[in-house]
Structure formats: structure tokens, C-alpha cells
A protein has these predicted regions:
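N-terminal leader/targeting segments and the immediately adjacent pre-domain N-terminus
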Residues: 2-5, 13, 21-24, 30, ...
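Active-site-proximal loop and beta-strand segments within enzyme catalytic domains
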Residues: 57-58, 79, 83-108, 138, ...
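Active-site SXXK
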Residues: 67, 123, 137-162, 188, ...
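Catalytic-site signature segments of enzymes, centered on catalytic residues
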Residues: 125-134, 198-276, 298
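Active-site-proximal alpha-helical segments within enzyme catalytic domains
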Residues: 144-148, 236-243, 296-319, 373-389
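Active-site helix/loop module of the DD-peptidase/beta-lactamase fold
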Residues: 156-194, 248-296
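Active-site Gly/Thr loop motif
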Residues: 268, 278-294, 336-384
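Short, gly/Ser/Thr-rich active-site loops of penicillin-recognizing serine hydrolases
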Residues: 394-405
Length: 405
């Protein structure tokens, strides 16, 4: 064999070895990519999830890249900036909404506790203040739990597509009018339906009417095409809850408990209420249709720690300790901005252009309720922050984020 031929064969051999080596490296890279989560470069198996009960592991802020002194300053700021509303939440509701036509409280209420909160970093508790195990009303934070039940229905195939008209699923007349027949699940979830009607003796037009408008003008207003206008409206949110009840054929709190809350180790103390007149028959069984907030009483009554678990589930994209409880697709869907109001998704608030929480990243999304109740999910910093009865959310968030080194 000539030197030239030997050199050619050696080149082919070396090229073959190079291809094999590159293939091996590519294979290892793919395995590594699948095995590891983008969160802090940790594998899914190594991510910490708190066990059921009150033994949620605490870590020193410095162990997780935070400054304990600055974090304590955030806690002290939160304690000094409590919401100024009355402890008697029945009175607080009446003070805020009694100007509405035919207003009355028809769901349970209770006195609230002191301001409290918790900060979760990488799954661990790094700060906590006040009584975080106390069960309190959480008002419109309830909407994010309701949205989750809708996501579970989509995952289970009970809802085929959020763009389908709700009329295909609810056939008792509530979606029969020419306008209401156009309303989809998508419209109910992002509060752009402009549904017209009465539910639980509450007219859609009587919820948060424009100041100075006459009742005749409001009642006779021109309906807006579904999807064209955002209107925060608890009658229509309660309609979503009622519609989901028709789909699930079981009480929504049972669905939430079995599929989410029990599996993330939440306590058994939380409750999800409806109204005294929101009982319906489902397959011969008397079931209460729950509310999406505490506007007329009712809604979720829950502790800060249980809400933190719920927030952590969404931070982990619907996965809890290796089990996908709600699809990652749904977690992404709730964060899609509504075109007519880009700071709102599927019953989660978004921080588009930092309009809602100026101190936080634009990617932050959060549940929000009357009286200063929040569950904040910050993917960029691997944080869940739950604050109850705060008068200055941005101030609290600003100081927490300033503690990250």
C-alpha cells in the first residue's frame, strides 16, 4: 500500500472516529437536556417540593443567593404597609360595592387576620411573617383557582377547545340569545364575553356600573361583540363556574381538591363557597355552584401557605414532584395576553410592559384579590411570593427582589 493510500485511509478512519465522537457528544447533550430543568440547572428529581403538613423546609437566604438583611427589610416594609380596610370584611365589601343596584351579600364572609406573607425561593421558605396558616377570604384570587379547573377540563377532554361556543356544553338557555350564542370558553376566561343575563339574582349590568351612569342607560346599552372589550365582571365569572359545573357534573371544590390541592400537600382547611341561592341539581344531586370571588361573599377561604403551594405548582409549570397535575400547555395559555387588555390572561394578571408591578420582571404573572391579596409567580428569579392584606404590593416586591444577589 502506498503512502498516499495509507494517508487517505487514515483520514477516512479519523473522520469516522470524529463523526462517532460528535454523535456521542450530541447524544449525551440530549440526555442532559432532557434530564435537567431550566430552573437553576437542576434536574427535575432534585427540585424540592414541600411534603404535606407544616414541615416546609426553610433555608437561609444566603444559601439561595439572597441577602438576609435586605430581605428582612422587605418583611418589615410589608408589616408596616397593611391594607387600611376594616377587619370586618362584610363591612369592607359593603363599603366598596353597596352603590351597585340591588346589592346584598349572599355568601359567607369572615373577619380577616393581620397582614402576613411568605417568600419561596427554589422551593424553600426564605422569609415568612404573620400567621400564614390562618384561613381567610382571598376574594378574586379565587379566579385563578377557577381558571385551573377549566384547564383540568381541557386536559381531560371534557372541553374540546377553548374556542368552542359554550352553548355546545350548556343547554339550559343561558347561551341561547343571538349574542350569547357566540361566546366561547376563551371569552369567559379572559372576561371579554359581554354576556347578557341574570345569574343568582344578579344582573350582568349591575356589577361595577360606570360612575354617573343611569340604570336605564346601563340596562339598554348596546352589547359588544365577544372578544372586543374587557369588562371585569363577577356575574360572568360566576357563569364560568356554573358552566364548568355543567361540564364536570361534580362540585368544583371536589375536582380542585382531588386533582390539585391534595396532590400538592395542601391542608384540609380551605373552603370554596358559593351563595345561599346558587344551589342546582346535577344528575339528581343538589350541588352548590361556587363563586369566583368575594364580591357578594363566598369564594375561596384559604391560608397563605396553601396558596404558596398552588403558586409553586405554577412556577413548576404544572408539575409536582415529577407528576404533571395540569398540563404545561395550560400554564402557558393562562399567560397569553388578552389583545384588548394585555395585562390579563386566563384569570391571571400579567405584568406586560411592567404596567402592574413596575419593580418586577415583565414575565411575572399573579393572582390578585380585593384587600391586597396576591400570589406572585416569578419564573426569572424562581420565586413565589404570597402577600395578604398589603397596601403596597410593588413596594414589597421591590424590596424582595433587591435582596437577590
Amino acid at each position: 500500500m502506498s503512502l498516499k493510500q495509507n494517508s487517505s485511509n487514515l483520514t477516512k478512519f479519523n473522520n469516522s472516529r470524529l463523526v462517532k465522537a460528535l454523535s456521542s457528544l450530541l447524544f449525551l447533550f440530549l440526555i442532559f437536556s432532557l434530564a435537567f430543568s431550566p430552573v437553576e440547572g437542576k434536574s427535575k428529581k432534585s427540585l424540592y417540593f414541600p411534603p404535606k403538613g407544616d414541615s416546609w423546609e426553610k433555608r437561609k437566604p444566603e444559601d439561595l443567593g439572597m441577602d438576609s438583611k435586605l430581605l428582612q427589610e422587605a418583611v418589615e416594609f410589608a408589616l408596616k404597609n397593611e391594607w387600611k380596610g376594616p377587619k370586618d370584611l362584610k363591612k369592607a365589601i359593603e363599603n366598596s360595592f353597596s352603590r351597585e343596584s340591588f346589592f346584598s351579600i349572599i355568601g359567607p364572609t369572615k373577619e380577616r387576620g393581620e397582614t402576613n406573607g411568605i417568600v419561596i425561593r427554589n422551593g424553600y421558605v426564605v422569609a415568612e411573617w404573620g400567621d400564614t396558616e390562618r384561613v381567610d377570604m382571598t376574594f378574586s384570587v379565587t379566579k385563578s383557582f377557577l381558571s385551573t379547573v377549566a384547564g383540568l377540563a381541557l386536559d381531560a377532554g371534557l372541553i374540546r377547545d377553548v374556542q368552542e361556543p359554550v352553548k355546545k356544553y350548556v343547554k339550559d338557555g343561558k347561551f341561547d340569545s343571538e349574542h350569547n350564542a357566540k361566546i366561547t370558553w376563551h371569552h369567559l376566561l379572559n372576561q371579554t364575553s359581554d354576556w347578557s343575563g341574570t345569574l343568582w339574582d344578579r344582573q350582568d349590568w349591575a356589577d361595577r356600573p360606570p360612575k354617573g351612569a343611569t340604570w336605564d342607560k346601563i340596562r339598554n346599552r348596546k352589547l359588544i361583540e365577544p372578544g372586543k372589550n374587557f369588562k371585569y365582571n363577577d356575574v360572568r365569572v360566576n357563569l364560568l363556574a356554573y358552566s364548568l359545573l355543567q361540564v364536570w357534573r361534580l362540585p368544583l371544590p371536589v375536582i380542585l381538591r382531588e386533582k390539585i390541592m391534595d396532590r400538592i400537600g395542601a391542608s384540609s382547611a380551605w373552603r370554596w363557597h358559593g351563595y345561599e341561592n346558587s344551589w342546582v341539581l346535577i344528575d339528581g344531586m343538589k350541588v352548590q355552584s361556587v363563586s369566583g370571588g368575594g364580591h357578594w361573599g363566598g369564594g375561596m377561604f384559604i391560608s397563605t401557605r396553601d396558596q404558596a403551594r398552588f403558586g409553586l405548582l405554577f412556577l413548576r409549570k404544572g408539575n409536582w414532584s415529577g407528576k404533571q397535575l395540569i398540563s404545561q400547555k395550560w400554564v402557558s395559555m393562562v399567560q397569553v395576553p388578552t389583545p384588548v387588555v394585555p395585562v390579563y390572561g386566563y384569570m391571571w394578571w400579567l405584568n406586560t410592559k411592567k404596567l402592574r408591578i413596575p419593580s418586577a420582571p415583565e414575565s411575572v404573572y399573579f393572582a390578585a384579590g380585593f384587600g391586597g391579596n396576591y400570589i406572585v409567580v416569578d419564573n426569572e428569579h424562581d420565586l413565589v411570593i404570597v402577600v395578604r392584606w398589603t397596601g403596597d404590593l410593588d413596594g414589597v416586591i421591590n424590596r424582595i427582589l433587591a435582596s437577590i444577589r
